[in-house]
Structures are given as C-alpha cells and as structure tokens.
Regions:
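Extracellular/luminal immunoglobulin-like beta-sandwich modules
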Residues: 78-107
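Immunoglobulin-superfamily Ig-like beta-sandwich domains in protein ectodomains
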Residues: 1-5, 9, 35-64
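Non-cytosolic beta-sheet module surface loops
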Residues: 23-27
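Solvent-exposed loop/turn motifs of extracellular immunoglobulin-like beta-sandwich domains
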Residues: 13-22, 58-62, 69-82
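Short beta-strand element of the conserved SAM-dependent methyltransferase core
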Residues: 64-65, 101
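Solvent-exposed loop segments of extracellular immunoglobulin-like
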Residues: 28-33
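Eukaryotic intrinsically disordered and solvent-exposed regulatory patches
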Residues: 6-9, 17-21, 66-67, 87-88
Length: 107
C-alpha cells in the first residue's frame, strides 16, 4: 500500500524565486499529480518541474514539485499532492492536506 513519508508544507517565496513543495510517498506505484486551489497543475518546463526528475519517474516516491520564477497570480495558493491508486483493484490513492504557498508581495 502507498503511504505518506512527507506531505507538502507551508512555504514562502519571493517573487521571481524558486521553491520546492515536498511530497514523498512510500511504496509509490501510482502517478503523482498536483493541484493549486482545487485546479490541476501540469508539469511545464521552465515553470513547474519535478524537484528530482529521475526520482519522480521511478518508484522512489519523490513527487516533490519545484516552482520556478514564482509569481503571485499563478503560484500563491493552497497546493495538494495526489497519487493515483497502485492498480484499479486497490483503493490506495493519496491526497495530501493542503499546503499554502505564499508569494511575498512588495508591501
């Protein structure tokens, strides 16, 4: 069965900076997915990438997401890591608690 090793946690980042949202799964067999404020977010080179690309592709369980060039409009919000079930017979999909990512403004 898949289970959490590390769930996403609160992060702060300056505009234009990079930030890694952790998400590590034990016995990962399903696929990693990310959502921001309830909306799916895909992997996009130059913006959203796997923090450890070789790890995410393998079964190591590291689904951590790296946000590049953070900005308030696209990146500030509540992020969730999700993992699809190991197989259609198992109900071991995972949905993390929401973790806030705060893009600091110029106040």
């Amino acid at each position: 069965m898949q289970e959490w090793s590390k769930q996403p946690e609160y992060q702060e980042v300056n505009p234009g900076g990079d930030v890694i949202i952790p998400c590590i799964i034990i016995n990962k067999k399903g696929e990693c997915r990310w959502e921001r404020d309830g909306q799916p977010v895909g992997i996009h080179p130059g913006k959203y990438i796997w923090a450890n690309p070789n790890e995410a592709a393998a079964e190591s369980g590291d689904c951590s997401l790296k946000i590049l060039d953070a900005n308030l409009e696209f990146d500030d919000g509540v992020w969730q890591c999700q993992v699809t079930p190991s197989s259609f017979q198992l109900r071991d999909s995972l949905i993390s608690e929401g973790a806030e990512v705060v893009v600091r403004g110029n106040y």
